[in-house]
């Protein structure tokens, strides 16, 4: 029976991974490692769940928290393209924090690491080039924001660490998973958009081109892909060792506006008029100045305006081929759970 650790386990995705691990037959103990205290810690009658408050940049504390662990699912990250954190803060957690986790793997002889990367490790790029493809599609990877850069660098670090020698001459095996736009209960950004619509009289004003298609994926299916990858990476000859996979399900691929309307229309939200692009650019520039001068974050800035209007559509079944992944939550269930959460959080 194994001991798993989930860094960022008190977060949006991490909590769902912990919930699913409770049903994993081969897991005896789950260590939930996060810099913040979980206000609603998950409990179980069949698994030992230990919560450890820890900064992943503190090697000594990380080493202590991971001593005796067999496998790490590393989700801890600062996900920010709005200006809440400085560039240095984002790099410190996302890149250097991953370095710390890898160093602990080597020092403690932990043989398996599943890393939560991001679609932004690939794109959309700073040029606004559309992406339609799979893990092996050629694309100009040129990050336009420090968050994307940090996830790209951390993913490369984890991929390079695969098959490296650790304590007692054993080998470290790694795998990276790249979620596209995650939604589901607990998604703060979806909640912000819903609240804005309510403030505007149940109207969603459109800010994104209809042909800017983005792949989306439900948080429960992303979590399930992590749990499956953690199982399969331990098999001799597993194809996932040293590989990266996009996270996907059968959620509709469409523009951000259209997706939000599909999700929220049963909650009384109606489509509004389109805000002119020149006006959006003007507000984005103003918000960028506020971020620079006053450290005031904003959902609308020049970076988010560009990437939301740039197609990023994933078409792949590689996770199914290599580790037998298929979604365990269909779209109707995913939407219903998300809607229920939005209603209850009003």
Swiss-Prot record:
Question: Which keywords belong to this entry?
Answer: Early protein, Host-virus interaction, Isomerase, Multifunctional enzyme, NAD, Oxidoreductase, Steroidogenesis, Viral immunoevasion
The record's InterPro entries line, in alphabetical order, gives: 3Beta_OHSteriod_DH/Estase, Lipid_A_modif_metabolic_enz, NAD(P)-bd_dom_sf
Biological process, per Gene Ontology: steroid biosynthetic process
Q: What do we know about what induces or represses this protein's expression?
A: Expressed in the early phase of the viral replicative cycle.
Q: Which residues constitute the signal peptide according to the record?
A: none
Q: Which SUPFAM superfamilies match?
A: NAD(P)-binding Rossmann-fold domains
- TM segment ranges: none
**Molecular function, one GO term:** isomerase activity
One protein family per Pfam: 3Beta_HSD
Q: Which reaction does it catalyse?
A: a 3beta-hydroxy-Delta(5)-steroid + NAD(+) = a 3-oxo-Delta(5)-steroid + NADH + H(+); a 3-oxo-Delta(5)-steroid = a 3-oxo-Delta(4)-steroid
Q: Annotated pathway, please?
A: Lipid metabolism; steroid biosynthesis
Q: What is its EC number?
A: 1.1.1.145, 5.3.3.1
- Residues of the active site are 147 (proton acceptor)
Residue sites binding NAD(+) per the record: 151
Q: Which family does it belong to?
A: Belongs to the 3-beta-HSD family.
Under PANTHER family, the record lists:
BIFUNCTIONAL POLYMYXIN RESISTANCE PROTEIN ARNA, SHORT CHAIN DEHYDROGENASE_REDUCTASE FAMILY 42E, MEMBER 2
Q: What does this protein do?
A: Catalyzes the oxidative conversion of Delta(5)-ene-3-beta-hydroxy steroid, and the oxidative conversion of ketosteroids. The 3-beta-HSD enzymatic system plays a crucial role in the biosynthesis of all classes of hormonal steroids. During viral infection, steroid production contributes to virulence by inhibiting the host inflammatory response.
Name this polypeptide is given = 3 beta-hydroxysteroid dehydrogenase/Delta 5-->4-isomerase
Organism equals: Monkeypox virus
């Amino acid at each position: 029976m194994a001991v798993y650790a989930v860094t960022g386990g008190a977060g949006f995705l991490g909590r769902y991974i912990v919930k699913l691990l409770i049903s994993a037959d081969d897991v005896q103990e789950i260590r939930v490692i996060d810099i913040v205290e979980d206000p609603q810690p998950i409990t179980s009658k069949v698994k030992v769940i230990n919560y450890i408050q820890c900064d992943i940049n503190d090697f000594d504390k990380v080493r202590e928290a991971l001593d005796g662990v067999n496998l790490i699912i590393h989700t801890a990250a600062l996900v920010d393209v709005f200006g809440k954190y400085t560039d240095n803060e984002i790099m410190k957690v996302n890149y250097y924090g991953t370095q710390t986790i890898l160093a602990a793997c080597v020092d403690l002889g932990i043989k398996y690491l599943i890393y939560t990367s991001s679609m932004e490790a690939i794109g959309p790029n700073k040029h606004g080039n559309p992406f339609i493809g799979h893990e092996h599609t050629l694309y100009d990877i040129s990050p336009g924001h420090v968050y994307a850069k940090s996830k790209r660098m951390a993913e490369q670090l984890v991929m390079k660490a695969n098959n490296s020698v650790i304590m007692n001459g054993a080998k470290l095996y790694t795998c990276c998973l790249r979620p596209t736009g995650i939604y589901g209960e607990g998604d703060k950004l979806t909640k912000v958009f819903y609240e804005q619509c309510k403030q505007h009289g149940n109207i969603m004003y459109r800010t994104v081109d209809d042909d800017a298609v983005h792949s989306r994926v439900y948080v429960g299916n992303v979590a399930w892909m992590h749990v499956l990858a953690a199982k399969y990476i331990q098999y001799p000859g597993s194809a996932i060792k040293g590989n990266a996979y996009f996270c996907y399900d059968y959620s509709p691929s469409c523009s951000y506006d259209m997706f939000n309307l599909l999700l929220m229309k049963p909650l009384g939200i109606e489509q509004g008029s389109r805000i002119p692009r020149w006006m959006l650019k003007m507000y984005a520039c103003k918000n960028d100045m506020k971020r620079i001068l006053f450290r005031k974050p904003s959902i609308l800035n020049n970076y988010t305006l560009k990437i939301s209007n740039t197609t990023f559509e994933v078409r792949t079944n590689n996770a199914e081929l290599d580790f037998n992944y298929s979604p365990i939550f269909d779209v109707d269930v995913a939407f219903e759970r998300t809607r229920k959460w939005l209603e209850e959080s009003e």
